[in-house]
A protein has these predicted regions:
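Conserved SAM/AdoMet-binding glycine-rich loop
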Residues: 1-128
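Auxiliary Fe-S-binding modules of radical SAM enzymes
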Residues: 88, 103, 111-219
């Protein structure tokens, strides 16, 4: 079987390649897809299902449409709704949607929009919401932007958990604490490199990382 990542959905010959793989009797899967590509090319979810894939995985990027525009992501609610319809039509087990919380400028209203929209998706087909705290990556357009903070991210996740109760939606969050560690390392320098060694030497727990990174901040 073959497997690709999100960039695979940008390949101009993807549909033809998937058809060739499926027609030859092989299995195929793509770890995640751009939602707009799935919406605009309905053969993609059909062929992936024929290739034995049972989870249709797409990226939503941010909690609200306004935020997706601000971080220049082309995904719209219409694209995501089309993905849910495709997951239902081709009998996928679940639609998995990756998205971020804690994007700079995000408000409580944006989280409410995410709750209501996820419930709309879940009314069409079961949803697994993979939620990761926003961490600015070096050498990307969002490099240098701040981390929302552990307490803010945890409150966002708690609201999502509460708001999705009773819906066909499972919340699969990434730890706010470990996202903070990732942020410090992504935006750090040599002092953070030394902190990695100290954290590992002192057991590697979050408390060890927090202490080690706290020391590096004081240097």
């Amino acid at each position: 079987g073959g497997r690709g990542g999100a960039a695979s959905s940008d390949h101009p010959g993807l549909v033809e390649l998937l058809a060739w793989i499926v027609d030859s009797g092989r299995g195929v899967g793509i770890s995640s897809l751009r939602a707009d590509r799935v919406a605009l090319k309905p053969d993609i979810p059909r062929l992936l299902r024929a290739g034995g894939y049972s989870t249709l995985t797409v990226a939503s990027d941010a909690a609200a449409q306004r935020l997706r525009r601000e971080i220049q992501k082309g995904t719209t609610e219409a694209h995501l709704l089309a993905c849910a319809e495709a997951a239902r039509e081709h009998r996928y087990r679940v639609l998995k949607v990756y998205m971020m919380v804690g994007v700079p400028g995000e408000t409580a209203d944006d989280i409410e929009e995410l709750v209501s929209f996820t419930r709309r998706l879940a009314a069409i087909h079961p949803v697994a919401l993979g939620v990761a705290p926003f961490v600015a990556k070096v050498h990307t357009p969002l490099d240098g932007l701040p981390f929302a903070g552990i307490k803010v991210v945890e409150s966002r996740l708690a609201r999502l958990r509460q708001g999705l109760r009773g819906a066909r939606a499972e919340l699969r969050p990434t730890s706010a604490r470990w996202a903070w560690v990732e942020h410090r390392l992504a935006q750090g320098g040599p002092a953070e490199g030394e902190a990695v060694l100290r954290a590992v030497e002192t057991g590697g727990s979050f408390a060890a990382w927090k202490a080690a990174l706290g020391e590096s901040r004081l240097r």
